[in-house]
Amino acid sequence: MTAKIGIVGSGNIGWALKQMLREDYEIRQGDITDGFDASNIEHVKKFLTGLDAVISAGPFSVNKNIAGIASKEGIAYFDLTEDVETTDFIRGLKSKSILMPQCGLAPGAINICAAGMMEEFDSVSEVLMRVGALPRFTTNEMSYYLSWSTNGLINEYCNEADAIYEGKAVKLMPLEGAEKIVIEGESFEAFNTSGGCATMCETFEDKVENLTYKTIRYPGHLNHMKFLFNDLHLKKNKDCLLYTSDAADEP
């Protein structure tokens, strides 16, 4: 019997998930463009009926609804959220099924890789996680192409970043801590963003001296973001920021 998997969202990530899973599973996909509103509890209940698992590839704001109902119905739940508060909510749910948030590149794969490498050593003094989903070539002033959620990106850039400093869990300001990275002769910049550490600061507090996560971008991107978020105070007007970011990302 083929397992039934639901995918919430049919954007770039939702589309990719369907391509990867459709040959081995029965897929049900729902998106706001099809009339499925994941912020509506009744819509979510109907969508989840009969599923074995659900993957949320929608905005993080709908994940509490989906995870909450999945936990009650015993449906396995996965998402790719970077939102710390949403993750804490899901971790607090009780269910007989698997509830696994933060299954993306970062948080997700980068944390598995880092934790796996740490296990190879008797003691670890410093862990530096640096991740950037970048286009090979850029065509706009922001030197970036958004391949995932605009809401998620704004969330990463607005909220505090988790880190471990001198063995203790701390909070760092987003868009700060800039550093230069050179990869195969090409220069990049990296800076603090929220969510990338997942729960590592909780897991490894007092077990590692320093642990940080930063997002990699092409040079100049950070200055543009600081202008939008800080100088224009758009971090306090996220609707305007969302519109601006989407408009700038159009081809």
Regions from the language model: what does each represent?
Residues 10:
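Glycine-rich Rossmann-fold phosphate-binding loop(s) that bind the pyrophosphate
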Residues 31-42:
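Adenosine-cofactor binding site in Rossmann-like domains, unifying the SAM/SAH pocket
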Residues 122-241:
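Active-site-lining helix/loop region of Rossmann-like oxidoreductase modules
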Residues 82-99:
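Rossmann-fold NAD(P)-binding glycine/threonine-rich loop
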Residues 13:
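Hydrophobic/small residue at the entry helix of a nucleotide-binding pocket
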Residues 53-67, 74, 79-86:
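N-terminal glycine-rich "phosphate-gripper" loop used for MgATP/nucleotide binding
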Residues 243-251:
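Single conserved hydrophobic/aromatic residue that forms the stacking wall/gate
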